[in-house]
Amino acid sequence: MSKYYDEALIPAEMRRTFDVYDRIRALQLPLGSFETDVVSLANAGIAGAVLHDSGLVYLSGTTGGTLPMADDEERIKHGQDGAQKIADTLIKRLHWALRCGGEGDLNDVLYTVKALGMVVSPGGGAFRGAPAVVNGFSFRWHSVFGGPRGDYAQNGLDAGGFAGIHARSALGGFDGRFSIETEIIVAIPSALARDIIQNRGWLFPLPPVMLDKVKALHR
């Protein structure tokens, strides 16, 4: 782990014991490339990620799936698969938000704070499966960062720790031409957050002047 992680104020008993990237490779989760994923914020309506100097990282939501949800096993599986793809997308975004300037990476994630899942489904209590759909997102986070419902858990425990489990809201009754939108907040060491902000700002994608700076360092 990095010096940031090693110096973070978390109990020794709850420190992660594995390299996140080993799990990412085993799960065949694509991380893209610097050239395709580190881009300019010019003309953007929102940021993909915002870093706070406290160490909180807020990731904007993105959508997954193509069908509205219904109380049907096959339809819920479609939503869960879409939710898992959202998790993959946000993990990739977080990777570059932390790494593009050379300051940190996903091994610096201390723990996951809160997720919000919004499910496209009939309202008024007609559909009650929103939590099951959002599990596709949450359990992927468990698999990558550690958690009791991930692919590496046995008998309800992950020997790698609990950094992926999080508080969560899962709500149905939303409209849209997709299945689910999910956003998440994670915690990194405050020292790392401050170094990133001082080096290239608090936004990802990057403002043009900061993108030029990071590209010059990357060459």
What are these regions (language model features)?
Residues 1-92, 96-110, 123-219:
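N-terminal presequence-like segments and the immediate start of the first folded domain
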Residues 114-121:
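Short glycine-rich or small-residue beta-strand-to-loop segments that form or flank ligand, phosphate
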